[in-house]
Design a protein with these regions (language model features):
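Non-catalytic pre-domain segments flanking phosphatase-related domains
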Residues: 2-10, 14, 19-81
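C-terminal cap/substrate-recognition subdomain and adjoining C-terminal extension
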Residues: 23-35, 49, 145-210
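Second-shell loop/turn segments in exported
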Residues: 44-53, 110-118, 139-146, 171-173
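Stable alpha-helical elements in mature extracytoplasmic
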Residues: 54-62, 120-123, 127, 149, ...
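Sec-exported extracytoplasmic/periplasmic mature domains
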Residues: 67, 71, 92-93, 129-137, ...
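Active-site neighborhood of HAD-like aspartate-dependent phosphohydrolases
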Residues: 72-78, 87-118
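Structural recognition of the beta-strand scaffold that forms the well-ordered cores
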Residues: 78-81, 88-89, 137-142, 169-172, ...
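Substrate-recognition element of Asp-dependent hydrolases with the DxDx(T/V) motif
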Residues: 85, 124-157, 199
Length: 210
């Protein structure tokens, strides 16, 4: 009886191990398929003239909106922008994910930020520097982590030619992802936000995202 129980236990354990291996294989295959779906999008971002033209068009429209914006007496003009895929181009990181069949991982992302190898979205530097030299102030409201991703972000943006990227201009993620509270912090400093630029509805506050 004891021998039978041992054999049954061993058989059950073997089945569990085999099932675990099969699950891991399926998971790896699913990740590979998911990452391959990003290839066309990456090619478009990195190689198409249309992407560049649309990006410049968006920033030209933002510049016009900034120039025509009026603020209440005593208020200062502010522009709020997201960073990733709005100001900074992280398509090389996405390409690495495809090549290695890797899903998003927070630790890998932090290593990418620390590597200081981001590119720039077409038109972003010109718009940023125009606002900061024409009576406005740029604020960078991003869900990059405030604790360990700010230094790499600032260094990268300085390298890419952005002006006005001092520490106080950054409102990165400390605990919560929604950005409305950070927008309010900016407004409490006497600013009126006249333009928002982003690639996600959360970049425009609760009125739109909620």
């Amino acid at each position: 009886m004891k021998t039978t129980l041992k054999l049954t236990a061993i058989a059950a354990m073997s089945a569990f191990i085999l099932t675990g291996c099969a699950t891991q294989d399926k998971s790896a295959e699913a990740n590979a398929q998911l990452q391959q779906q990003a290839v066309l999008g990456l090619n478009w971002i990195q190689q198409s003239g249309e992407y560049q033209a649309l990006s410049y068009q968006a920033y030209n429209a933002a510049k016009v909106a900034f120039d025509h914006a009026k603020v209440k007496k005593g208020k200062k003009k502010a522009v709020v922008v997201d960073l990733d895929e709005t100001m900074l181009d992280n398509s090389p990181y996405a390409g690495w994910q495809v090549q290695n069949n890797k899903p998003f991982d927070g630790k890998d992302w932090t290593r990418w930020v620390e590597a200081r190898q981001s590119g720039v979205v077409p038109g972003a530097v010109e718009f940023n520097n125009y606002v900061n030299t024409h009576g406005g102030k740029m604020f960078y409201v991003s869900n990059r982590k405030d604790s360990n991703e700010k230094a790499g972000t600032i260094d990268d943006m300085k390298r890419l030619g952005f002006n006005g990227v001092e520490d106080s201009a950054f409102y990165l993620k400390k605990d919560k992802s929604p950005k409305a509270a950070r927008f309010e912090e900016i407004e409490k400093q006497g600013y009126e936000i006249v333009v928002y630029v982003g690639d996600n509805l959360d970049d425009f506050g609760d009125a739109i995202y909620g």
